[in-house]
């Protein structure tokens, strides 16, 4: 599944694209946590009950990684993507628990050329991630560079 946006010129401010993932599993939450974020509430259901969140859940960083995988599988790997200079903001709204399914809405916030680099453009997008019940899980505001279909001037 792709949104048809391959080159910089394909991204229009205000465009919305929706996609979804598969259920998050307890096993993948633990596997990620054991390697990257070994806090009790990501590793043990009983210990999680006494945490500030009160429930066993995925690491926020795991949620970012899951979103990135969905982005790659859904459209990025088919696009003329060059890279990203960074993320403006990530907000974790609700714990991600086993069985949650990411329902993602991507909105194009800005699309501008890069001064002195006529072969590419910068796209700012906002991701709004909800679960299968429409409850907000996370948001992310970020930038990505894409090749132009037709380079402008010297590169």
Map each language-model feature to its residues:
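HotDog/MaoC-like acyl-thioester-processing domains
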Residues: 3-12, 92, 96-155
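Hot-dog-fold acyl-thioester-processing enzymes
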Residues: 1-85, 151-155
